[in-house]
Amino acid sequence: GVAGSLAIHERYLKQYRGITAATVTPQMLAKCKVLKERIVQQWSSGNDLKYLDSIPGVTPFLGATILAELQPLDRFQKIDQIIAFAGLDPSVKQTGGKPGNHGALSKRGSRTLRQALYLAAFGTFHHAFRPLYDAYRNRGLAHTEVLCILSRKILRIAVALLKKRRMFDPAYLDRT
């Protein structure tokens, strides 16, 4: 199994290289931290990241990820295309001539963008998005469903901010 395979590799590394998992893990975590900082630094050098950073709960790393996945924005004609690219559009289940029912998320497109938006939604519902989160929860929607709705909302806001080159304004929550 996997555990046995890992044990064999760990013994090999320890025996021939003097390396143990205890020494590798902190080194890998440190390298990951440095890479994240470099990514944010690289994307911060452009002006577009500041617009996404202005959204409450969106971290610089998530903002950089969202920006990297959306660029160039002019390849999309409509916001619905961007939502579909993120895989945040509902799938339609249809059979024969019967009208379709909306099901779960389609999950087409960029998995990385979808995950970044979901994490951003998870961070934002503690801030300016809390009233919106509570309103959807009071309608009987599950926590995950509301986070998916907030993900779409964040995507719409992010695209509007990038196109209009403006900082986040809580009034956007009522307009999008």
Each predicted region: which residue ranges?
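A detector of single, family-specific signature residues
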Residues: 1-176
